[in-house]
């Protein structure tokens, strides 16, 4: 049963009649944005399961059927008996999982544009009581194994934070994806030096549909030890899943979640929307649609003389350089987008509910301002 005022459909628009119901018409004002998949509302499948989970009472702190079913569904999809945890957001997922892999005197090797370095306010260092992030270079947002090995072998004395983890962002902060052979090369390097592999998969579903591989093939079969899987950016209101493919690494992890304020008492309201995404296949449909819209946006941009995306469009974002007056003019028209992500330029992000009409309107406004 759907909530009143919510329309069904593959491109369900979350801007519903809430404002009228609560006496504030301004809440109906649509946002003109290609800023972030975090701006988007809840997709119908996640919302349906959330409402279903709200029928009656259920045990607290994850001891409910919804949480068990969602965890089991992850195990089926990833074809392994992994440990599954649910937390509220990606910063907590990354920070707590990295803390589980490290002691305070260890270090984590990540790309210089990785979210754990640029956008988590020191969360990984805080959760681990001081594990240091070592920054590696690499083209298009991806780790270069040569650079990773340089950081591993640069020093081995007692004064240097001992490398313990390689963190991979899939898809990357620049909208590119690691190919299977690139993942395997990093795993081979990690094995050589006895390091663990952490994957920040806030947009893992976008990479998955691009590569047309199985979830297992792109994670534990490629050597990933822990995956932080994003739901918030893919149609959920809140909630990420942490999958430990090496179950021993999850020892006492529930205590970390509780201590960090990440043990949801009504966990079914995180788990049920996840189940909705997974059981209906919406997690892949949503990601595929977002990717297709980004590809369409990149195509329209390339048709404008003098404009060229900065990186290959392999997931759901497009980066490009625009003159400052054009950026200001677009914002004056009400368009919202980011200019502080990655290596600069404008980031345009598509989501599960981005429409061609919105992209066409953006292109029309952009062409007018460039004229």
Regions found by a protein language model. Name each.
Residues 8-26:
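Short, Lys/Arg-enriched N-terminal segments with co-localized hydrophobic residues
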Residues 28-333, 339-354, 362-370:
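Conserved PLP-enzyme active-site core in the AAT-like
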């Amino acid at each position: 049963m759907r909530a009143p005022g919510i329309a069904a459909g593959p491109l369900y628009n979350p801007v519903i009649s809430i404002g009228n119901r609560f006496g504030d018409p301004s809440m109906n004002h649509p946002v003109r944005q290609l800023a972030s998949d975090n701006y988007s509302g809840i997709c119908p499948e996640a919302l349906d399961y959330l409402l279903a989970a709200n029928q009656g009472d259920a045990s607290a702190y994850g001891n409910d059927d919804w949480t068990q079913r969602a965890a089991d569904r992850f195990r089926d999809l990833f074809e392994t008996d992994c440990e599954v945890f649910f937390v509220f957001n990606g910063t907590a997922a990354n920070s707590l999982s990295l803390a589980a892999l490290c002691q305070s005197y260890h270090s984590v090797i990540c790309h210089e544009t990785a979210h754990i370095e640029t956008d988590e306010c020191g969360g990984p260092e805080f959760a681990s009581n001081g594990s240091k992030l070592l920054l590696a270079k690499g083209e298009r947002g991806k780790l270069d194994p040569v650079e990773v090995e340089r950081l591993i072998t640069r020093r081995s004395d007692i004064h240097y934070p001992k490398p313990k983890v390689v963190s991979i962002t899939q898809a990357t902060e620049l909208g590119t994806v690691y190919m299977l052979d690139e993942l395997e090369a990093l795993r081979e390097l990690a094995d050589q030096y006895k390091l663990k592999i952490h994957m920040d998969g806030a947009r893992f579903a976008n990479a998955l549909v691009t590569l047309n591989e199985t979830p297992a093939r792109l994670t534990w079969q490629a050597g990933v030890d822990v995956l932080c899987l994003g739901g918030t950016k893919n149609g959920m209101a809140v909630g990420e899943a942490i999958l430990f493919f090496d179950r021993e690494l999850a020892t006492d992890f529930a205590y970390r979640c509780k201590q960090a304020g990440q043990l949801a008492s009504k966990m079914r309201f995180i788990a049920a929307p996840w189940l909705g995404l997974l059981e209906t296949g919406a997690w892949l449909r949503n990601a595929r649609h977002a990717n297709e819209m980004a590809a369409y946006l990149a195509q329209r941009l390339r048709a404008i003389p003098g404009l060229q995306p900065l990186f290959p469009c392999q997931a759901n974002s497009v980066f490009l350089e625009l003159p400052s007056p054009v950026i200001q003019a677009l914002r004056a028209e009400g368009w919202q987008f980011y200019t502080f992500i990655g290596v600069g330029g404008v980031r345009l992000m598509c989501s599960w509910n981005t429409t061609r009409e919105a992209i066409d309107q953006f292109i029309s406004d952009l062409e007018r301002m460039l004229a």
